């Protein structure tokens, strides 16, 4: 009876030119379409968000995240809407509907649905008018008319840069907000907790042998590949982790001072070129991302109490070990 499947790895990883049933992917897409089932896959987004796959990997091993290994280049901006006080609640709701103010570098204090509206300084708006459009009631001196004292409110939020245009358009669609002043401002303090991989540390050092055993247990690994720097009795406290194929970040992990790097799909030459004392653990692509279902289940059951959410027990690792 389900009508939505949520997955980490996308059903359609490469673009389809047709859906004719000639490949496994095409047949799966056809089955979903015929059954009216939507498929939502959070792949790179779940890899790079705070609390995503790499965070969950560290949590499984009992390590505390210190920071992101490779910070995201996604740019954020601050959108500021100055409008009459009576429109502030409507503006706030529009921003909330677009998930504004939930970004890591925002305290979202101005977007709490029940937060009191905070006025800017009591503003005096001067409207310059052409001579022929002057109101009948003159102002205090020639050429200056219609001096209005209006209580204004400024509503602000931090949003990804790509959302700004759509947000601004939505605000102007609010009845009465056509003339609202909308400023989109750059940020110097870009979020540092979004990106790929994490650097984490254990409360107490563990041996590499203990770490290997824990990896096998927590991620269900039949086997793991390790680099020449692996020494069973060597102690490890700081580790770097990256779910999925993380070979390109070996240098980042080494520069960050990690004593062990846990990822997947490490190439032969990456193992051969690693001349440092940092040990590399290749635990398998599927295994490294096995915590994704836990993340989805936790988010959905906590946010949507009235949804029937089923945790699939089907494991579909395409790699088999002999």
Report each predicted region and the residues it spans.
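Hydrophobic structural segments
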Residues: 1-322
């Amino acid at each position: 009876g389900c009508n939505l499947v949520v997955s980490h790895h996308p059903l359609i990883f490469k673009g389809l030119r047709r859906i004719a049933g000639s490949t496994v992917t095409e047949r799966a897409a056809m089955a979903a379409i015929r059954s009216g089932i939507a498929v939502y896959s959070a792949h790179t987004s779940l890899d790079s968000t705070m609390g995503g796959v790499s965070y969950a990997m560290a949590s499984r091993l009992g390590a505390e995240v210190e920071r992101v290994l490779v910070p995201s280049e996604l740019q954020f901006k601050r959108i500021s809407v100055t409008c009459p006080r009576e429109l502030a609640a409507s503006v706030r709701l529009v921003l909330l509907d677009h998930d504004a103010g939930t970004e890591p570098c925002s305290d979202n204090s101005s977007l709490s649905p029940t937060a009191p509206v905070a006025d800017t300084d009591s503003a005096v708006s001067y409207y310059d008018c052409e001579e022929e459009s002057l109101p009948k009631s003159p102002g205090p001196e020639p050429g200056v008319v219609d001096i209005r004292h209006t209580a204004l409110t400024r509503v602000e939020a931090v949003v990804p840069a790509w959302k700004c245009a759509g947000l601004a358009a939505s605000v102007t669609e609010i009845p009465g907000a056509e003339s609202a002043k909308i400023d989109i401002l750059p940020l110097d303090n870009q979020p540092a907790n979004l990106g790929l991989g994490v650097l984490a540390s254990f409360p107490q050092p563990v041996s590499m042998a203990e770490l290997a055993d824990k990896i096998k247990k927590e991620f269900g690994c039949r086997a793991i590949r390790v680099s020449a720097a692996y020494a069973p009795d060597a102690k490890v406290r700081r580790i770097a982790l990256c779910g999925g194929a993380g070979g390109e970040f070996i240098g980042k992990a080494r520069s960050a001072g990690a004593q062990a790097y846990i990822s997947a799909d490490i190439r032969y030459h990456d193992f051969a070129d690693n001349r440092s004392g940092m040990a590399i653990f290749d635990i398998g692509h599927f295994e490294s991302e096995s915590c994704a279902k836990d993340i989805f289940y936790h988010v959905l059951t906590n946010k949507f109490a009235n949804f029937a959410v089923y945790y699939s027990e089907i494991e579909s690792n395409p790699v088999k070990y002999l």
